[in-house]
Amino acid sequence: MKKFIITGLSVLLLVGCGAPQEKEDAQSKQEEQVVNASDENMVVFPEGAMSIGEGKVKVITPDGTSENGNIPTVFIKKDTLIQQVELELSNFQSDKETFVFVDQMYTDKHQVTSTTQTTVQLKEKALETGSHTITAVQYENNDPKGKVISFNQATFETKPAS
């Protein structure tokens, strides 16, 4: 009888000690996948590119738009972590993805029809007081490492809200 009890307790101890290891392995694999997923989304800003193509970028704020060279203002409250700004993309090639950058940092990509309205999230440095640039870029074969076929920008400024 004692042998059965000792054997039973030994089995329980072995099973109990083995389970957390599997859990840790699963957690580490999950973290690895998250890191790899963020690497895939890295798109480098095309340095030295000049305005090309017929696409147009328009920033829309409650203060106005960037149409006709105007520079609209976004008022940022003191403890804001994320601020959205409306963006209108037009006249881009509809068969290509349009990559959007804020201050040369990749934020998102869109499939643009004749005119597409969307929002861009301003974070961290883009919330600092000053002038900022939103850039829309299209690449040959939708490959960010390829040739730039459309490159257009719009400027806005941020100021602290009173």
Question: Residue locations for each model-derived region?
Answer:
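N-terminal, intrinsically disordered, polar/charged segments of Gram-positive cell-envelope systems
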Residues: 6, 18-75
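C-terminal motif of bacterial Sec signal peptides marking the signal peptidase cleavage site
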Residues: 13-16
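Short edge beta-strand/loop segments characteristic of extracellular beta-sandwich folds
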Residues: 82-90
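Short proline/glycine-enriched turn/loop motifs at strand-loop junctions of beta-rich domains
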Residues: 91-96
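Short beta-strand segments within Ig-like beta-sandwich modules, predominantly Fibronectin type-III
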Residues: 108-116
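Surface-exposed, short loops/turns at beta-strand junctions within beta-sandwich domains
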Residues: 123-131
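Short acidic/polar inter-strand loop motif in beta-rich domains
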Residues: 139-147
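Short beta-strand elements
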Residues: 146-162
